[in-house]
Amino acid sequence: MNVGSPAPDFSLPDQQGRTCSLSAFRGQWVVLYFYPKDDTPGCTTEACGFRDDYLAARKLGVEILGVSVNSPESHAKFSDKYGLPFPLLADTDGKVASLYGALWSLGPIRFARRQTFLIDPQGRIARIYRKVDPGSHTREVIEAIRLLQHAAK
C-alpha cells in the first residue's frame, strides 16, 4: 500500500455495535488509525490526543476512525472511560489491519500495529505514518491535513 493508492474499503462494528464502512466517509478526509489494545498507556495517550484535537479535526472536515482487534464491548468501555467522541472499530479477526499492512502477530496473539493512514476525499491514501509517537502524533496529523488541504486548493 502506497501514497496515492485507493484506500481499501471495509465495514466493521463500532463501540455501539453499529456497522461503519469507510466508503460512508467518501467526500471528506479520514484519519484511519490502528492501535494495539484498548486502555493501555500508549493507546490511551493516542486516543486522548485525538479526543482533544477532535473539534479542530471536525472544523477541517475530518473524521477520525480508530481500529484495533478488541471487541465492540471493550471499545465501548474504553470510549466511555475517556469520553472518546469518534468511532472505535472492532477488527476482531484482524482482516482489516492485515489489509492495511498493520497486523502484528506474536505466535497466536495478534495486534494492530500503531499506524495511521490519512485518506483524502476521493478515497486515496494521502499519507502513511508507520512509526507513531502517541504523545505528539495527533497534532502532527492535524497539521499534515491542513497542509494537504491547502496544497489541494
Name these PLM-found stretches.
Residues 1-153:
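Chalcogenol-based redox active-site neighborhoods
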